[in-house]
């Protein structure tokens, strides 16, 4: 009996083992099937996402009513917007994603503009600083509507932001109108966008625009002895670099820019992003702005402002603006301020704390919201700095 029982128990154990093995095999097969479904779904999501991005970033004619000014997204029957320097950037995943991001930023910026009532000023629009038909090689001139004949007003040259990839001078129109209405001649300039070109070509465009202003500024009620160059965000980087390039023939040769033959009285930098190589995680975005081959270019050693400032003879008095809600550039603005001070530049920084207006003011708030109390105050303080610089210059 004992043997039979043991024998029966042995058979039962074997059956259970077989059942367990069968169940395990089925479970393994089921898990494989489950993973296959998950992978299939992920691949489908990726394909749909890629298709969505491609459709969202299709180029539109520069004559279309719904054109969006984003690099690589404007086409023409007569103008070639891409010059080859940005070759390969259109396939860069960061650039493709940011094209889509900037597209949706465009809607928000237009809504902000529609809600604002800029002052009426005299405007001369779409002047070509390079006669090639490229809409990005144009600028506007704005000055007070009540300017008297023979008047000579201090000049301000503005370079818009937009992450080097987005926007045109219209983005800063209301801001420039606010500046002009306070008694200035304002030049609002365009420049080509990444990925049609790279940051280097943008600096070339800015230099050409500055040279045009130097040659033609006297045609407007403009005192060319007093000029403040200003820019916000990416435009702040272009402004800061341009101020140095004005003073260094060696750097102009490296960057292949013309000599603007211009002397600045002051520099105004709003949330400048001037450290593109050593900017932490943000550099994943900023480094490709110099091209897919940025490491092989002569400009590679000069992608951060602290790498070029020693080439400047004497930068003009510089005013910097940032805010507690400026998550993109608060640290960069403070870092730039420290570099300027360390090199003996007369510099002031205004970092708007949350307590001042009971809110965390966003990135470039004074440019995008120039008629809000905080924006108005920021502009007034910056212009007071410019006035002080003019007074000091006149006393020399």
Where are these regions (language model features)?
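N-terminal Lys/Arg-rich, disordered targeting/topogenic segments
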Residues: 3-34
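Alpha/beta-hydrolase superfamily serine-hydrolase fold, recognizing
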Residues: 34, 38-396
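Intrinsically disordered, low-complexity regions enriched in polar/acidic and amide residues
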Residues: 1, 18-20, 236, 395
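Exposed, low-complexity/repetitive linear segments and helix-based recognition motifs
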Residues: 1, 9-12, 51, 229
């Amino acid at each position: 009996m004992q043997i039979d029982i043991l024998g029966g128990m042995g058979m039962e154990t074997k059956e259970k083992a077989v059942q367990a093995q069968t169940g395990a095999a089925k479970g393994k097969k089921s898990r494989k099937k489950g993973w296959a479904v998950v992978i299939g779904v992920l691949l489908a999501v990726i394909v749909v996402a890629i298709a969505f991005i491609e459709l969202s970033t299709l180029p539109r004619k520069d004559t279309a009513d719904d054109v969006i000014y984003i690099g690589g997204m404007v086409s023409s029957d007569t103008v070639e917007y891409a010059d080859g320097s940005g070759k390969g950037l259109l396939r860069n995943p960061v650039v493709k994603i940011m094209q889509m991001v900037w597209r949706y930023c465009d809607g928000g910026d237009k809504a902000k503009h529609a809600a604002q009532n800029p002052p009426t000023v005299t405007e001369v629009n779409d002047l070509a600083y390079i006669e090639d038909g490229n809409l990005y090689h144009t600028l506007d001139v704005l000055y007070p509507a009540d300017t008297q004949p023979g008047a000579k007003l201090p000049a301000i040259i503005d370079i818009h932001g937009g992450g080097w990839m987005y926007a045109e001078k219209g983005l800063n129109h209301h801001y420039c109108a606010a500046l002009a209405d306070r008694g200035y001649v304002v030049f609002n300039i365009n420049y080509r966008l990444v990925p049609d070109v790279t940051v280097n070509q943008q600096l070339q465009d800015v230099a050409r625009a500055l040279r045009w202003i130097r040659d033609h500024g006297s045609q407007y009620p403009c005192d060319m002895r007093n000029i403040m160059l200003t820019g916000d965000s990416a435009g702040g980087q272009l402004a800061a670099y341009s101020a140095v390039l004005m003073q260094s023939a060696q750097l102009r040769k490296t960057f292949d820019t013309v000599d603007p033959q211009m002397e600045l009285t002051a520099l105004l930098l709003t949330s400048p992003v001037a450290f593109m190589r050593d900017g932490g995680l943000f550099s994943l975005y900023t480094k490709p702005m110099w091209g897919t081959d940025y490491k092989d270019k002569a400009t590679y050693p000069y992608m951060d402002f602290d790498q070029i400032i020693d080439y400047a003879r004497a930068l003009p008095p510089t005013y910097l603006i940032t805010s507690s809600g400026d998550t993109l550039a608060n640290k960069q603005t403070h870092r730039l301020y420290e570099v300027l001070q360390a090199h003996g530049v007369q510099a002031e920084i205004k970092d708007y704390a949350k307590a001042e207006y009971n809110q965390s003011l966003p990135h470039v708030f004074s440019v995008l919201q120039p008629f809000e109390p905080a924006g108005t105050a920021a502009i007034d303080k910056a212009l007071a700095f410019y006035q002080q610089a003019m007074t000091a210059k006149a006393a020399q």
